[in-house]
Design a protein with these regions (language model features):
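Polybasic, low-complexity association/targeting segments
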Residues: 1-16
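Active-site phosphate/pyrophosphate-binding segments
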Residues: 13-20, 27, 35, 39, ...
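Short helix-capping/linker segments at secondary-structure and domain boundaries
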Residues: 33-34, 73, 164-174, 238-239, ...
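Glycine-rich phosphate-binding loops that contact phosphosugars or nucleotide phosphates
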Residues: 44-188, 208, 275-299
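A generic structural motif
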Residues: 79-80, 240-252, 299-308
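C-terminal active-site/capping subdomain that shapes the small-molecule cofactor and substrate pocket
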Residues: 255-340
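Short, small/acidic-rich helices and loops at N termini and domain boundaries
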Residues: 337-350
Length: 351
């Protein structure tokens, strides 16, 4: 497929995943505004926060935890499993249960745990059993409208949480920083959208480099969850193998595992997501780690996050990755939306 022939993308992209990616900046802004308006009852003092969810419904919490890591004064963890950890108990614990469909069994398990343990709880979803049970239990529900895959609703999963934390008084108003971020995203988007030719489109060129390779995404600091997002987008959108690694931890193990089996070395591709706002030593580590990979014969590249703030850099790196994963899917002649193995597993689990 010629990536310059963007009018033919719809022959592969039968459910228009491209539209969802194009709309991410607007979705992020819409979600924050919605979250500032939805009903929120008064809450008791909070000493810990747990966000329970899976997949595309959990990544927004990952992103928020990373974004706020330098300013949030209470512990905030993302829980991807069934029963909540033992410390999630009592009125001083806030449990946020997020499920796009409202039927995710792990999220439902976490919700029931939270109610049993007397936690303050709020539900974020489009519908399903989760909202039904929340309404019966008298738990606040933040319902949003979105038709599509959970991974395409990352603006909602992040933006609603950003508004929630603002309204709880955990962080200052984010309106100005969000407006700046949307501007950065819009300017980036103008350079990487589908109608921009390959010669001028760095996202399309990057996708071309990934074809036939096993992709490893490296990041550090607050960009670590963006590396996870790149990995999961490659899995779900391009139906391709990918892993993510976090610096500095990867320098204490992964770096030693790049030699064997020797015949696979040249099938690897290491992508480094850089931030000018990261810890100076991590910036050095990212550069040195990339050098070592190159010396071992592994192809590498990097993306420098755009903007001057953590929020802008977080989201610009995410948006660029979403476009790269999409163009990779097109080059693989793969529909970006359907995920048959995941659907099959869910059906098997409910049989």
């Amino acid at each position: 497929m010629d990536l310059d022939d963007h009018k033919r993308f719809s022959h592969i992209d039968t459910e228009n995943m491209l539209k969802h990616i194009d709309q991410l900046p607007a979705q992020l802004n819409e979600a924050y505004q919605l979250g500032m308006e939805l009903e929120l009852p008064a809450m008791k003092p909070i000493t810990r926060i747990v966000s329970a969810g899976m997949g595309g419904s959990a990544i927004g919490a990952d992103l928020l935890a990373a974004y706020l890591s330098d300013r949030l004064s209470v512990p905030f963890i993302v829980h991807r499993d069934y029963n909540l950890p033992a410390f999630a108990a009592g009125k001083d614990t806030l449990v946020i249960v997020s499920s796009h469909s409202g039927n995710t069994e792990e999220a439902l398990s976490g919700f029931r745990n939270a109610i049993e343990r007397g936690c303050q709880t709020i539900v974020i979803s489009t519908g399903g059993k989760l909202i039904e049970e929340a309404l019966k239990a008298g738990v606040p529900v933040w319902k949003f409208a979105h038709i599509g895959q959970p991974r395409a609703a990352v603006g909602f999963s992040f933006g609603l949480l950003l508004a929630l934390f603002t309204r709880l008084g955990l962080i200052p108003d984010q309106s100005a920083e969000l407006a700046n971020t949307i501007d950065v995203l819009n300017r980036l988007q103008e350079r990487i959208k589908a109608d921009v030719p390959v010669l001028k489109n760095s996202a399309k060129r990057q996708a071309g480099q990934f074809i036939g390779r096993n992709v490893m995404i490296f990041a550090s600091g607050f960009l670590a969850p963006v590396a996870r997002r790149w990995k999961t987008q490659f899995n779900e959108v391009a139906k391709a193998f990918a892993v993510f690694e976090v610096i500095p931890e990867a320098d204490h193990n992964t770096l030693a595992g790049i030699c064997n089996p020797p015949q696979q070395v040249f099938q690897q591709y290491a992508m480094f997501l850089n931030s000018s706002l990261d810890h100076p030593r991590n910036q050095v580590r990212m550069a040195k780690t990339r050098e070592i990979f190159m010396l071992e014969g592994i192809a590498t590249d990097s993306f420098n996050a755009k903007g001057d703030t953590r929020l802008a850099q977080l989201w610009s790196a995410l948006l660029f990755g979403d476009y790269v994963a999409y163009y990779t899917a097109i080059l693989y002649d793969t529909d970006p939306t359907p995920i048959p193995p995941i659907v099959a597993l869910k059906e098997a689990m409910t049989a």
